Amino acid sequence: AGHGSFLHDENAVTYLAEAVAKLGNHTFPLVISDSVAEFLSAVAEETGLDFDPASPDLDGTLRKLGSIARIVGATLRDTANPTMLKAGYKANVIPQTAEAVIDCRVVPGRQAEFEREVDELIGPNVEREWITALDSYETTFDGHLVDAMNAAVLAHDENGRTVPYMLSGGTDAKAFAKLGIRCFGFAPLKLPPELDFAALFHGVDERVPVESLEFGTQVLEHFLLHS
């Protein structure tokens, strides 16, 4: 700590700002998990697009998916998005400490490598700790529940197809997995093609069309009554 009018070789805000910028601008390596591979294969069959992991323009191909490209892209690699900053108590005082919160989403099986990369990026002047630490979770797409999901969708949309995907957001599946319970995300919505649904998440106008909810309710009712 010290007076803001003096020269300072060490500044917690500067150290933190540099670390946060490096993390926020870093692109983690491409990782295709089994679930994502199955999803891309199914989408390729339906759209004719070629999702070749070796392609230098894989991200460009993903953009052709439209509004879901950001969701799918977030499952192909780890992400570390700065969301909160805290430092200082007065404009003319150099603070002793500075803190940042980084929203990290790690592809299953990448935890150790992710932490190593983060440590290299933030450097020796910044310490890190996990606020919440639960391993990423993935299961195989099979079993009677999967069959019941598919049957429920087909009962209300004869052109529907149930495919696995990986959710970059957090769910209770991470906790249930520790108890040996397999979890699947199943929230069927029939959305208008022009709606950028992902852009509404945690936004000022977050919403879902009533018709989409009605469809989802019918599918879930069928699922619960027949599974």
Q: PLM features: residue spans?
A:
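Metal-dependent amide/peptide-bond hydrolase catalytic core
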Residues: 1-215, 221, 225
